[in-house]
């Protein structure tokens, strides 16, 4: 072939080869160019490319090598001599982004010169160097191979025709080299882009292997840049890996910028060689018979199997699965797609680290495109995969909406043939799509998402089984996010009867569902957008305001919910209401707390005797509660109250809000009973600042009065964060709480008051074993998250979870964080606006569920089960021993000076460690190891000034036990990690007698592990039954007595049964399972006797016998199957009996008196032991006995003294330190 013809052929071949890789690009050839032609070509290409990448391919065969300065050679105008072209000039013409290919000997000289230029360049030029890529055929000192085995332009051949080049090179080195004609390689049938042909499958395998090599050896950011952002760049670098492998066999080392690590010996090349050998072995037959059926290579099947093996044994701590890029390629094949998606789903379920790896390999565009398929079998697994992706990377929402992916999930959510757990995942995906993304909100609203969610929130048949709680939760969260700061969607929701539908969920047993419903309702409340307040839309605005007020009425009724998560969402929602209705609430507040009305406030009608069931039903929630305004309206002197309440109806006297709003929030609450002022300051000159979007006119002043009273209640919530939100809401309306009982002095200084908040803004719930934490280990469940399981009431099992307000912010990778900023009760600044709203946390916290493994059980559960089984064995052994023991308690094995200022009020022996917990009236809690005589931990139950302790109780004793601290004002706080020095965490807190102010400060408690019930009562006519599993008040039992309750004891045998001792010395037994509740009444103590100070069911498993002790000193033994008269009486003390303890299993009881004496009795009335003196040389008397408690499984007795603050522990003579 003549030289000019050869030159033209080379150029056309190179053009066609590049065009195969990027057919849409424009290519321009310059054969033997001059300097001016190169410059013009570069400038023209950059002009047309604009900001796109320009490829510059230099074939330097037949011209001198590059100079030491990195100059390449071109011709002058007359083609009489070579002229050097510096790389700096080339770079200045092409600019960036660009990619250079230099196929010539000593090509490394050019790369070296380019790198030196980068070092000399300014920082701005260096910053654009990432957009410049160089591929060079060899290093600076190397010459290209001239062997007949390789073509002259072997580097270019590898970059542009990799399959044929790889097969030729492999054939010369395989066992096929003698039996196969090499020219057949050029006749491989098929098309490169058709995976069902031999050439297409080989190209597919080659792509998968080179991607796998690159992903496993390159940093992930470099892999993304080179292999996932530009199709041509990705193809060139895949082929560059082949060039390195082939040319290194000829002692040439291709180099690149950015520099890649060596890959020519990677073991995945062996997989390529095997695939190539299988192909070449079939090639003669396929060429001889073009109609022969094509048999796919087993490569992808084998790689998927290898990936599956890794899934069975791999973990985050092990090396990542190298097959991940291959799995991605397999998604392109319909025959392997389902299996690949299933395996990919299993991998993503391993945790956020797995999702991050999958995203780094480039999964996103593949699974995005799959949303366009209509294959029914892929729906469940695609929803699962997208759930896992979005649980880590919210930014994917933009591309999902852009490609219409939201419609796919709306259709899935609306399909009844999918499992509820899977539809919950679809709701989660949609919630992420609309989260803070107005385009997503508009798209989903226009697609009817509001109507779909509302339709599935309400069962078609009221008798249908309860919807999966996880689905209810995420339907509410999805609606809330759709309505958030989107007035048009809010209006659609109000017009679609959304409040009435969502309000029905406020009585659901799951706190997560209730909190999510509150979140949705709260986002229906407009925080003050003026868009709907125009003069032409007054009637529409009135309707909107009425709807908002109905929403707020329902929220006010659950402001005393047992779950801090729910109460926190209520507080956030009510703060939104305070902003949107700021003007009118402030005017009502000003009227409420005018100084001249103080005398009237003292005459507020007492609501203390109004009974509160506090068990919310959907109907009562929907009815509203504006009737409360009729109780306080005349006193508040708000003119429209009466008409408003007459129009909207009155609540029943059993409504929980009727007894808690005013009595808790008014100046006559317990905190101000000793003071003439209200403890509330009205900031007359408080500026609205950014709160000028208030409504143009009031609709119902009664609701504003009720709102203020409730927020005063919220501002005293036992959970610090909720209290701080309440104070912030009060400050928004110009009201500030001040300490009504001056902070008590502690250590010479003022003790922090209620305004304090935790040092951490962490918040949320962490279930120890909740309905959404139970994981299914059966993969055949088709990516279902497990459904709710009803409580398994089993002895020694009991409560499975208690809500935790501890929040883990690493759940989502979000730049703005997950936790809400700390709040204080300081006055709001004059420029306050939307940024002062406390953040809702239920959504971000709920997202954490999907970032955890859903398909497999966790090792933590296995460890917990093993620990529980071991503790059950220990407990049974100890029970058997103590039942056979003498129980004489004659040996004092430990004595601990707690240094409590007011003496020891309560003590508790832990069942599986030598630990005793003690507390005083100031609610200081101290933990001590009595075997080692060492302190373990000390902390305060709270930092409020009002103090008083009632009881210490242990929850989940066979698991990671929780410490319940009951305060005498009815507040309950539950702690975990209380035996770790400084590691205690507040799990939950709530008021157990919310609204019963007449109960005073004498609330008594007891806990029933089997049922998960906490019983609370006091100087009141009702006994409140709280389900701590549901975090909900489930029953209010009327005591039918004329006096209050002084002692409570729950049966450890019969769920729902408990005994109560009264101030009038009577005894009653109740059972929540019976219609009448009351099952036994007796007056075993003498007439006009003092109150019952202790009561308990007798040891063992007999549910019919109880023991009651009165302050007069007598102990009565009762059998409920007989008459109400006692069958045994012990005159234990002559008055001043202060404490009674009944062992759970051993046949022994103990009593203690203020006269420094402890007596131990058998169940037959025999006095086993009397303790008067300390076992010391001086023989001092023991202190006045404030509390007694037995070890649950051993013959150990702890006694706390009231005067000398000692806690003494007594045992049998043969006690041995464990």
Swiss-Prot record:
PROSITE patterns: WD_REPEATS_2 (PS50082), WD_REPEATS_REGION (PS50294). One of its GO terms (molecular function) is protein-macromolecule adaptor activity. SUPFAM superfamilies: ARM repeat, WD40 repeat-like. It comes from the Eukaryota. Keywords: Developmental protein, Growth regulation, Repeat, WD repeat. Residues 640-677 are annotated as: Disordered. Belongs to the WD repeat RAPTOR family. The target of rapamycin complex 1 (TORC1) is composed of at least RAPTOR, LST8 and TOR. Component of TORC1 complex, which is an essential cell growth regulator that controls plant development. Acts by recruiting substrates for TOR. Acts by activating transcription, protein synthesis and ribosome biogenesis, and inhibiting mRNA degradation and autophagy. This is Regulatory-associated protein of TOR 1. It comes from Oryza sativa subsp. japonica. The lineage of its organism: Eukaryota, Viridiplantae, Streptophyta, Embryophyta, Tracheophyta. The gene is RAPTOR1.
